[in-house]
């Protein structure tokens, strides 16, 4: 964190770099194996996200009351949202060669979550950390450092595009409510 005038802390933003050809191939190879089980992987990601960061459930009237991970796994609404999340990620991963398409897709996601759903953008960073954790576990024996770095770079790129969309629509950060903020952030990198 770095200080800016007014004693506000902001995250230092890394340059929004595109992935290299080798990084794109590493991400796409990993993703192809994950996406083969799209719904189950998506559900596992969302269940972990909501169990570890229950404040995120506040945006989902259909399952915000659920505490039991098994109940969440069985929820048709959660499963449907998991498929939407995985579908959006799939579009991004399939189009890593086309920065304009990636930017367009993530702008739509960001604007919808800012304007329609009123989701705090920090949840994108948290969710992407959970995604990286699940990928690392799925490929524990086959997730080399280069691939981890490529996914971490993609995570930063996604967050950068989504938060740019929030800024574009004039998002004003909501006043923090200690009952809705996550206690900790995921352990994954930037």
Swiss-Prot record:
It comes from the Eukaryota. One of its GO terms (biological process) is removal of superoxide radicals. Keywords: Cytoplasm, Disulfide bond, Heme, Iron, Metal-binding, Nucleus, Oxidoreductase. Monomeric. Homodimer; disulfide-linked in vitro. Also homooligomeric in vitro. This is Cytoglobin. Induction: Up-regulated upon hypoxia. It catalyses: Fe(II)-heme b-[protein] + nitric oxide + O2 = Fe(III)-heme b-[protein] + nitrate; Fe(III)-heme b-[protein] + nitric oxide + H2O = Fe(II)-heme b-[protein] + nitrite + 2 H(+); 2 superoxide + 2 H(+) = H2O2 + O2; H2O2 + AH2 = A + 2 H2O. Widely expressed (at protein level). Belongs to the globin family.
């Amino acid at each position: 964190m770095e200080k800016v005038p007014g004693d506000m802390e902001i995250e230092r933003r890394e340059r929004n770099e595109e992935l290299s050809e080798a990084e794109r191939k590493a991400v796409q190879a990993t993703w192809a194996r994950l996406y083969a089980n799209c719904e189950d992987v998506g559900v596992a990601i969302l269940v972990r996200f909501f169990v570890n960061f229950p404040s995120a459930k506040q945006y989902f009237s259909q399952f915000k009351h659920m505490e039991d991970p098994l109940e969440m796994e069985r929820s048709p609404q959660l499963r449907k949202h998991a498929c939407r999340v995985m579908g959006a990620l799939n579009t991004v991963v399939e189009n890593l060669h086309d920065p304009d398409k990636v930017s367009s897709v993530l702008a739509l996601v960001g604007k919808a979550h800012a304007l329609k759903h009123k989701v705090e953008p920090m949840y994108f960073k948290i969710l992407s950390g959970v995604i990286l954790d699940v990928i690392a576990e799925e490929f524990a024996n086959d997730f080399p450092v280069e691939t981890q770095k490529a996914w971490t770079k993609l995570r930063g790129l996604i967050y950068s595009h989504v938060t740019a969309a929030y800024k574009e629509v004039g998002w004003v950060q909501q006043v923090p409510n200690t009952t809705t903020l996550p206690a900790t952030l995921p352990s994954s990198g930037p």
